[in-house]
Every structure is written in structure tokens, then in C-alpha cells.
Amino acid sequence: MTNPKHVVQRYLDALVAGDLETIRDSFAADAVWTMYGELPIAGPWRGREAIVDDFLVAAGGTLYEPGSVEFEFPTLIGEGDTVVLEWRVRARTAAGGDYANAYCGLFRVRDGRIAEVREYLDTQYAARTLFGAAAPA
């Protein structure tokens, strides 16, 4: 049995390196990534191709200046098939502003691949900073 923490760490290493092939291989064909909230990129994103091509690559490529994204992964905890990850993103936005947000995700691993991700972040900050949306009154 593959250690779920190792599966998620492999994905994170590929993410930092920009290794699209390994990123794609990290997900089960029927994986689901849910980003909660009302952002234009909120999901669920269903299936490996939708997660990688339509969400991770497309959104990242349009929201941030190329080459400006920096990741930090201070916490990675696993038990059974579940891994909890805390991560931070710093970047220059496509509009030229600074972005720094903290995230938490619950990853479920099945048969050596990521089968589910539930992602949480400060969506009001992301809406203002990435999409120019005013916070609700």
C-alpha cells in the first residue's frame, strides 16, 4: 500500500517544479476537487483533466504573473487514507498586485492517487485581490 502522505508530497513536489506530467499522474481519473465558496473558480472540478487542465493550469495561468508563484507547506498530516495540508501562496497577480493567502485542504488517497480534495481559503480576500470583487456588505 502506498503511503498517502507520500502521494500528496509527490504532487506538491511536482507542483513546485512545474512538472505537469507528474501532477496529472498524481490524480485518479475520477478525482474530485472542491473549492468552497463563490469565487469564479470555485468547484467541484470532476475528473483528472478538469482538475489539472481547467482548474490548476488554466486558473493559475490567468490569475498570476508567470513565474511569480511561491508555495510554502508548513503542515502535512496523514492518517489512514486522509492527508491534511496547510499551504501558503505568495504571488504577483495578473493585474500586478501582491497576493498572499493561506489554504487548508483535505486530501483523500485511493490506490496511490489523489481521489478527492476539499480546499478552504479566505475567499473574500481572494475575490478582492484576484478578481477585483468587493466584499459583501
Identify the function of each model-found stretch:
Residues 1-29, 132-137:
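Short, low-complexity N-terminal intrinsically disordered segments enriched in polar/charged residues
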Residues 6-16, 42-45, 61-64, 86:
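Short, mixed-charge, low-aromatic patches
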Residues 3, 56-137:
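A beta-strand edge to alpha-helix "cap/lid" segment located at domain peripheries
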Residues 8-11, 23-24, 31, 47, ...:
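Hydrophobic pocket/interface hotspot
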Residues 22, 28-78:
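A solvent-exposed, acidic/Ser-Thr-rich amphipathic alpha-helical stretch
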Residues 17, 36, 42, 46, ...:
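Short glycine-rich loop/turn motifs that provide flexible caps or phosphate-binding loops at active sites
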Residues 1-2, 17, 23-26, 44-45, ...:
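Alpha-helical interaction segments
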